[in-house]
Amino acid sequence: MNRAAIRIIGIDPGLRNMGWGVIEASGSRLSFIACGSVHSQAGSSLAERLCALHEGLLGVIADLSPMEAAVEETFVNCDPQSALKLGQARGVALVAPALAGLPVAEYAANLIKKTVVGNGHAEKAQIAMMVKFLLPMSEAKSADAADALAVAITHAQLRASRALLKSVSSMSVQTR
C-alpha cells in the first residue's frame, strides 16, 4: 500500500465564515498543517460576499498546496432564504478547489461526527476536543476551523479505507 503523504483541505461552508483546515495523511498518521476561516462582510452584496469567499479559498489553496479537498454537506434549516444563501456559499466551497484542479469529496455532517467522535450526533465542543486529540499541534481558533479539520480527518480516514478495499478487491480478482 502506498504510504506517500497526501495533503488534504477540509472545508466547512458558511456565508459569514467559511472554515478551512489542512492536514497531511501518510497511512494512518495525520499531521496538522494549518487552519482558519475565510470571512465575508455582512453588509456587502451577496455577489461580493461570495467573491470574497472564493478569492480567500483560492488563496489558501495556492499557499498550502493541498492535493485533495473535502467539503461538508450543509444542513438545510427551515428558512428557505438562509438555506439558499448557504447553498450558494457551499457552491463556492466546491468550485474553488475544483478550479484549482483538486478532486473534491463531499461528506454528510453526521458521517463526519461519527468518523471523528464516534457519535453521529456529537456537539461542536466534542468535535473540537477530538480534533485536538487527533491533531495535537492544531490550534483551531474557531468552531468553523475545527469543523473543517474534522472534514479533512474524515476524508483521510475514509480515503484510506477505500484504498484498502480497492486493493483487496483487485487481489481477489487476480486470484480467480
Swiss-Prot record:
Q: Subunit composition?
A: Homodimer which binds Holliday junction (HJ) DNA. The HJ becomes 2-fold symmetrical on binding to RuvC with unstacked arms; it has a different conformation from HJ DNA in complex with RuvA. In the full resolvosome a probable DNA-RuvA(4)-RuvB(12)-RuvC(2) complex forms which resolves the HJ.
**Name of the protein in its database record:** Crossover junction endodeoxyribonuclease RuvC
Keyword annotations for this protein?
Answer: Cytoplasm, DNA damage, DNA recombination, DNA repair, DNA-binding, Endonuclease, Hydrolase, Magnesium, Metal-binding, Nuclease
What GO annotations for molecular function exist for this entry?
Answer: crossover junction DNA endonuclease activity; DNA binding; magnesium ion binding
Coarse class of the protein's main subcellular location: cytoplasm
What species was this sequence derived from? Answer: Methylocella silvestris (strain DSM 15510 / CIP 108128 / LMG 27833 / NCIMB 13906 / BL2)
Q: What catalytic activity does the UniProt entry give for this protein? A: Endonucleolytic cleavage at a junction such as a reciprocal single-stranded crossover between two homologous DNA duplexes (Holliday junction)
Lineage, top-rank taxon, reads: Bacteria
Taxonomically, what lineage is the organism? Bacteria, Pseudomonadati, Pseudomonadota, Alphaproteobacteria, Hyphomicrobiales
